[in-house]
């Protein structure tokens, strides 16, 4: 099945506090520059390059910084933004369509997603990503998994290296030492696609969390599938992570273009 990617909105979860990041200025983590562009823009540009052009930001913490950035006339011109108003969704297929709204500073991820449905009335399929993870996902391959009639959701999995050396022991003797081996079970790196209908088939409690409660409920129903990603995967959790990615970029100015 061939899908028109421009009709698939992408929700970017960028309203959290990012407490481990320890921002050196008053900007939220997602607006920290990782190249010539902020983190969130590199993520948006990757999606845009791959055919998506509608992005929804349910804002919360430091929302004024995001609003200031996206409404800046220079940024609108530089990135070809088309800023959408919730009362007048006039899309421009040649531009990056951005819609943001205040989802509440204390809203968790799952609540933020549900609050986006106000703007997804005629949408059956949408994507979700985090505002601090880079990966060169092949989205068309990932989306093809939704052709399975039992699939209602797809997430990207990744075999990451352990941060520690692993040892095999017998009778207190070390038989084998593996320096930072690949972890056998893939980790969830986000980059989701959902059929909207599944959100109305799952019983949700008010305080339920996206990863802790909602995804396990999908798994129990056997409707959550995963796409194994074998390319890049970089997460910005701390200033050290940001410095590492900046170093990669400074070594190769085309780093993000190759993603």
Model-derived features: positions:
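Residues at the starts of beta-strands that form the adenosine-phosphate
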Residues: 9, 53-55, 125, 150-153, ...
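Catalytic-core segments of class I nucleotidyltransferases/pyrophosphorylases
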Residues: 126-127, 134, 139-147, 159-162, ...
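Short, flexible hinge/linker loops that cap or flank conserved catalytic cores
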Residues: 2-5, 25, 92, 120, ...
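Conserved beta-strand scaffold positions in the cores of enzyme catalytic domains, especially
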Residues: 31, 98-100, 153, 224-226, ...
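Conserved beta-loop-beta/alpha segment of the NTase-like Rossmann-fold superfamily
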Residues: 66-170
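N-terminal glycine-rich phosphate-binding loop and ensuing alpha1 helix
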Residues: 2-68, 72
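Generic beta-sheet signal
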Residues: 13, 34, 58, 101-103, ...
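Well-ordered alpha-helical segments embedded in enzymatic catalytic cores
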Residues: 39-42, 112-115, 214
């Amino acid at each position: 099945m061939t899908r028109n990617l421009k009709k698939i909105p992408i929700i970017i979860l960028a309203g959290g506090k990012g407490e481990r990041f320890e921002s050196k200025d008053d900007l939220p983590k997602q607006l920290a520059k990782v190249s010539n562009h902020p983190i969130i823009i590199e993520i948006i540009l990757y999606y845009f390059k791959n055919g998506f052009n509608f992005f929804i930001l349910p804002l919360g913490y430091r929302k004024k910084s995001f609003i200031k950035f996206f409404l800046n006339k220079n940024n609108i011109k530089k990135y070809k933004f088309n800023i959408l108003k919730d009362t007048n969704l006039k899309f421009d297929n040649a531009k990056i369509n951005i819609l943001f709204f205040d989802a509440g500073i204390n809203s968790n991820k799952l609540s933020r997603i549900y609050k986006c449905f106000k703007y997804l009335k005629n949408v059956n399929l949408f994507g979700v990503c985090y505002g601090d993870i880079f990966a060169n996902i092949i989205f068309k391959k990932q989306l093809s998994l939704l052709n399975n009639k039992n699939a209602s959701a797809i997430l990207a999995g990744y075999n990451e290296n352990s941060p520690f050396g692993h040892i095999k022991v017998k009778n207190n003797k070390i038989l084998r030492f593996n320096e930072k081996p690949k972890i056998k079970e893939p980790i969830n790196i986000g980059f989701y696609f959902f059929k909207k209908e599944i959100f109305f088939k799952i019983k949700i409690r008010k305080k339920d969390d996206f990863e802790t409660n909602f995804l396990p409920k999908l798994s129990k129903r056997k409707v959550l599938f995963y796409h194994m990603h074998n390319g890049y995967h970089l997460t910005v959790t701390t200033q050290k992570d940001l410095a590492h990615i900046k170093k990669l970029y400074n070594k190769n100015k085309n780093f993000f273009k190759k993603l």
